[in-house]
Design a protein with these regions (language model features):
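Glycine-rich phosphate-binding loops that contact phosphosugars or nucleotide phosphates
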Residues: 40-189, 269-317
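Active-site phosphate/pyrophosphate-binding segments
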Residues: 10-14, 18-46, 136-265
């Protein structure tokens, strides 16, 4: 029940996090601690995290590279800490953790500091170890999260990452003033869009009741949709105890598609217009092998119903933040 409660708290958590850094229509990172000069000097961004926070990092990598035009590497903190990483002294290491106490993430932070690289923690718990030890801190204002499976903390971590990407892009001259204002306005619409999605729960509950005996579930997507698929699959495992995997849709043909048989549930995530047709063709390929298809896309892409057995639509959003 805590999880249901926290799902419904997402709009407020996202809104609170945005309001903490958006002042008079502009992003203000003064409380985070990074100066404009420091942001201009960053040569590369490294992101370390575990679990759902790692999936945030995967999404952030796509957005930051596209907007900021800077190399971004995202890595599991549990791998990063043991492999003696080579870090650029002018790089920035971003560590994402809800609790701020995740052991592997904390170790990755300490390794980065040992190498003299600037660090930034995206954390939810004020005064936590990562918050204390990182050079800079972006607090997500999700409030206490009791459920084991993260919901509102995950959403606020995404928003924090997107906010950083927009501000970095502006400071480094990669986007115009008009784009900057547009992206900020787009972020401000997200809490209301989350509310609308949550209200549309009856169809999803009906669908879930029909699929309750599924043995294997595959989530597929491309680009940011792949990052979302990773999180969707983890949630499916954590909450339903049903075996689930996430794949970049283009990788299905390299062996995985042989696991799809009659009735296998395949959930396609298609929020990226430029990749929509590609992912749809992967879904059609799955259907030819007997898969039951669910499509998750934005309003307007109604042709998905020609192939998907069940479709879910979410409000249109700038593809970076979908």
């Amino acid at each position: 029940h805590f999880m249901i409660k926290e799902i419904h708290e997402q709009p407020k958590a996202v809104s609170d996090t945005l309001n903490s850094v958006i002042k008079d229509g502009m992003i203000d990172l003064s409380e985070v601690g990074l100066s404009e000069e420091e942001i201009k000097e960053i040569s590369q961004i490294y992101i370390g995290a575990c679990g759902s926070a790692y999936h945030v990092g995967v999404a952030a990598q796509y957005v930051m590279e596209d907007l900021v035009r800077i190399p971004v590497r995202v890595e599991l903190a549990s791998e990063f800490r043991y492999r003696n990483p080579i870090l650029d002294p002018k790089g920035l290491v971003i560590i994402i953790s809800q609790s701020g106490e995740t052991a592997d993430s904390l170790a990755a932070l300490r390794e980065s500091k040992k190498q003299g690289v600037k660090t930034l923690g995206i954390v939810n718990v004020i005064g936590s170890s990562i918050a204390r030890e990182a050079d800079n801190v972006f607090y997500t204002l999700a409030g206490p999260e009791i459920a084991v499976a993260t919901t509102k903390a995950y959403s606020t971590q995404l928003i924090a990452s997107y906010t950083l990407a927009i501000q970095f892009a502006k400071i480094r001259g990669q986007i115009t003033e008009e784009q900057y204002t547009g992206y900020i306005e787009e972020l401000k619409t997200i809490p209301d869009k989350i509310s609308r999605i949550i209200e549309d729960k009856e169809r999803l509950q009906w669908f879930a009741s029909k699929q309750v005996n599924a043995k294997d579930i595959f989530f597929i997507g491309r680009g940011i949709d792949y990052a979302i698929s990773l999180e969707g699959s983890l949630k499916m495992k954590e909450i339903s105890y049903i075996h689930s995997e996430a794949y970049a849709a283009g990788e299905l043909k390299h062996g995985t598609i042989s696991l799809i048989e009659d009735g296998t549930l395949v959930i396609g995530v298609l929020t990226q217009p430029a990749l929509y047709e590609k992912t749809l063709s992967n879904m059609v390929e799955c259907k030819s092998r007997g898969a039951y298809l669910m499509g998750l896309t934005t309003f307007g892409h109604y042709n998905i119903e020609e192939n998907a057995d069940f479709s879910v639509y979410i409000p249109k959003t700038d593809p970076h933040f979908a």
